[in-house]
A protein has these predicted regions:
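ATP-dependent carboxylate activation and anion-phosphoryl transfer catalytic cores
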Residues: 9, 42, 47, 54-242
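A conserved helix-loop-beta module that forms one wall/lid of the active-site cleft
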Residues: 1-43, 50
Length: 242
């Protein structure tokens, strides 16, 4: 659904197939047209859970089955979709705030390209070493998308940037405050949680115009993953004593 809505808002989407387009009779031909490697993703998933990369068709068949099984167990929904895997990529997300009634603004970008197991480790704003014109175009697309959905509240629209082709594609929208929102708050000096509360209470003393949003700092957020390297990096949150 997100890909369909993105297309209606004229956002570029990564070449791929939706769940209803995946059928054995034509799958190999369609995937050949997309080009390998291909990423298999759960439609209901998040946080990189269950994502598989396939370098050829035989790997793809196996990855589809694995992802479906994991998605059913984790999310109660086995639907999947396929996307062209961008090998030399940057992962950029735009923080937006929508006011409904066809109006939204952005609070600049966060770079979350440094990842492990498809999960973000470093969040940074401004994004280093990327053309400002690309960031501006992403921001424009993000605002247009939120505006067309008459979106209300804070949200994040994520893009993948192909460094070889100098193109970017819509990935997904997170319709909530994310754990990395403090990065944006630091660089813009805007409390997004407070803003959400004030908007919900129909108060009017918060940032509501794009011209009022300024960025004057640089911020980096690092996530800590509690894992035990001696046990093949199994989760290791520590011993609960109380």
């Amino acid at each position: 659904l997100a890909r369909e809505l993105a297309l209606k808002s004229d956002l570029p989407i990564c070449p791929g197939l939706n769940n209803n387009e995946i059928n054995p009779e034509s799958l190999e031909k369609k995937c050949s047209d997309i080009g390998f490697p291909i990423l298999v993703k759960s439609s209901a998933g998040g946080g990189g859970i269950g994502m598989q990369i396939a370098s050829d068709y035989s790997q793809l068949v196996e990855a589809i089955e694995k992802t479906k099984n994991l998605a059913e167990k984790a999310f109660g929904n086995s639907d999947i979709f396929l996307e062209k895997f961008i090998e030399n990529a940057r992962h950029i997300e735009i923080q937006i705030f929508g006011f409904g009634e066809k109006r939204a603004i952005h609070f600049y970008e966060r770079d979350c390209s440094i990842q492990r197991r498809f999960q973000k480790i470093i969040e940074e704003s401004p994004a280093p070493n990327i053309d400002k014109d690309i960031i501006n175009k992403m921001s424009e697309c993000a605002v247009n998308f939120a505006t067309n959905q008459q979106y209300e509240g804070a949200g994040t629209i994520e893009f993948i940037y192909d460094r070889d082709e100098h193109k970017f594609y819509f990935l997904e929208m997170n319709t909530r405050i994310q754990v990395e929102h403090p990065v944006t708050e630091v660089v813009t000096n805007v409390d997004l949680v407070e803003m959400q509360i004030k908007f919900a209470l129909k108060m009017d003393n918060y940032t509501s115009e794009q011209n009022d949003v300024n960025r004057s700092e640089h911020a980096i957020e690092c996530r800590i993953y509690a894992e035990d390297p001696s046990k093949q990096f199994l989760p290791s949150p520590g011993k609960i004593t109380k």
